């Protein structure tokens, strides 16, 4: 009986292990980079939402900066995290290759890539209110409801992306899901520390550059 062909972008939602098995021998491709870029854009949009209402950024500026800087940051983060997880997996007795790790990080973020479409739709309907942590009192009830639904959907899709990545690491590393979750958490901690270190170096070499690029939280 012939095996049903795999459709990675669709099947990864509910059959991640099979998807990552099928991708195990595939080289890194344009889809991996596009998914990483989409994840970076989504993260930048989420950061802009933490800015205070007195920043006076327009929707066009927010979307433009997110598409430009977020896409680059997403792809750079893909390679950074792939190197980290590749080394952690090897130390834990895993058997993955770098392309396999990249596939897990990229295709495991498909739900987050889907959240980007929700961000865009919310921005079109709600305007600048979509990027304010606390809506103004004069914002219409429908817009407030839309913003709450957008936040809830983002959190749920983020959690599902984490689940997919953990299951992916379990599959490619040949380890139990619990151990794969510990590997994922440790990798995130190391990735944060490395990113912080790199940010300090960039700030020392190019003062003020990151303040211009990265959205800053303002209470």
Positions of predicted regions on the chain:
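N-terminal juxtamembrane cytosolic/stromal segments of multi-pass membrane proteins
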Residues: 1-56
């Amino acid at each position: 009986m012939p095996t049903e062909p795999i459709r990675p972008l669709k099947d990864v939602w509910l059959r991640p292990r099979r998807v990552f098995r099928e991708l195990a021998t595939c080289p890194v491709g344009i889809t991996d980079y596009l998914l990483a870029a989409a994840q970076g854009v989504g993260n930048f949009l989420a950061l802009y939402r933490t800015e205070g209402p007195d920043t006076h950024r327009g929707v066009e500026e927010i979307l433009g900066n997110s598409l430009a800087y977020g896409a680059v940051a997403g792809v750079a983060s893909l390679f950074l995290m792939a190197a980290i997880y590749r080394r952690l997996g090897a130390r834990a007795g895993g058997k993955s290759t770098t392309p396999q790790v990249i596939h897990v990080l990229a295709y495991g973020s498909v739900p987050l890539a889907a959240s980007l479409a929700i961000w865009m739709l919310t921005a079109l309907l709600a305007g600048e209110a979509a990027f304010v942590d606390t809506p103004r009192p004069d914002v219409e009830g429908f817009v407030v409801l839309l913003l709450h639904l957008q936040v809830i959907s983002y959190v749920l899709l983020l959690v599902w992306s984490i689940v997919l990545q953990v299951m992916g690491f379990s599959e490619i590393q040949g380890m139990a899901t619990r151990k794969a979750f510990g590997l994922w958490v440790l990798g995130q901690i190391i990735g944060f520390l490395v990113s912080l270190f790199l940010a300090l170096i960039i700030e020392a070499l190019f003062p003020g550059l990151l303040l211009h690029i990265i959205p800053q939280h303002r209470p």
